[in-house]
Amino acid sequence: MEFRFTGNKLTGKDAKLQRLFEIAPGATSWIIIIGMIVLAFVHPLTAAVIIIAFYLYWLLRLLYMTLFLILSYFRLSAEENTNWMERVRGLDRIEEYLDELNKTPLEGDLKKRISFLAHRKEVQKLALAGADRPSSNDIYQLVIIPVAKETKDVFEPGIKSLEEGTFPAKQMVVILALEERASDQIKQDTEETVNTYKDKFFDMFIVIHPDGIIGEAKAKGANATFAAKKAAEYLKEKKIPFETVISSCFDSDTIVTTQYFASLTYYFLVCPYRQRASFQPVPVYNNNIWDAPGITRVLETGSSFFQLIESTNPEKLVTFSSHSMSFKALVDVDYWPVDMISDDSAIFWKSFIHFDGKYRVVPMYATLSMDAVVAETWWQTVKNVYKQKRRWAWGVENFPIVMRAFLENRKIPFFLKVKTGYKLFEGHISWTTWAFMLTIIGWLPAIFAGRDYSQSVFYYSVPRITGTIFHLASFSLITSIVLSLCLLPKNKGRHSILKRIGFAMQWLLVPLTIVFLSAVPALDAQTRLMLGKYMTFWVTDKVKK
């Protein structure tokens, strides 16, 4: 469906619907928060019953998510030592390769067996489908790295990691998408970097994004789109089919593992709908995790856990941060939105609408590493974390546009619209309200209890009920602590066992961080959207220590 994926410069009915749907998330969140506070004061017994019911629901959701977090982490760790390039080359001779796999006995530990069985099943399905697929020698990786104010020590390690991978660097085109407004020093840094690495790749060059193009916001999506359009011209000139190009838009601090692009190529080749799919790895924030304060580690690890959980249910998965997709699909949907802040999630919703709901995100059991938020001082770090989470929460700007598109699009099944719309709406509401319900509002009925309620059996039963619930919830906390330590990069000798113990103890900060550095920024973003006070793009400061 042809749909103008924007909330700007609308008129008539579209403008009214846009404002209605912009108001809905923020208004709902405020009604829930204020309504529960008022109810706790006016009728504490009713409020207590609602809170206990919410606690039970939260516990079930928490245990459910913890189970899938464990399963997803197990699968991720099972693929940690996989030779993805060997598998990719095997697909080029699929009949012979499948025969070899069928004759190969199951060996190794449980993780190796699971990895092997999953791989053999995928190859069997691919062979049975018999569909045409490109040879691995025909696959090209297009990597777009937007640069605004990041210095060489931020983006060069990521470029070096591209060159060191097992996927042939001579099948990679790397573009540094440089903002025209960048400082002279950064422009010089990008030129020096291109001169150093250009010969390592099929090609590498700089695309300068002009400042002040009409209709564009000062956002990463506008920069990436300008670079992608130049890439399209370049690929046509080189006679490289868009269907065989995998495009990746990476944050400037992204560092990939040696097997990353080999694994991406594998997931692309075995995907039956590769031209209608995005590919989402698990982001971890390990580049500077040893130097990050506890509040940052808790929040960034929580973001990684969320992606791990979502990867177990691809129907709920939405692109986030650094991700990849077929370049043909990117061209078909007319690239990233140029007037939106949340370009990483917006490109999924734009594709979902364009292809009438026939678009999916394929989870990759592979990681890529980025910087955790670290500033010169602890307080500046806190402020930067707040701004970053508010920017992430600004993804709520997708909701009104998606809802308008659902009303116009008759080809997307009604049930899929309802399910998808509810998932999107509920995700933003739970982001803002759950933390308040768990840490602040839950105490109010006892504080405002009148004589009738305070002398009831239920009043004396509540502490035991909530105590049992939170004791059961501690299983999830312990699991998070263990897995967070497992996700840490290898100790380079500078950090003692005491620091690892400190990393475990940091999870005691969860009640504070989820309220003030997660729920409050999200509520801030929703309130701004509700009031029509639209955000501008804020580039996270990158500080190397």
Q: How does the language model describe each region?
A:
Residues P168, E237, Y273-R274, N288-I289, ...:
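Intrinsically disordered or highly flexible coil/loop and linker segments, enriched in small
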Residues V373, W379, K383-N384, Q388, ...:
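Membrane-proximal soluble regions of multi-pass membrane proteins
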Residues F352-T432, I441-V457, I514:
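C-terminal catalytic/acceptor-binding lobe
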Residues M1-A131, I481, W507-T513, P521-L531:
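N-terminal membrane-anchoring/stem segments of glycan-assembly enzymes
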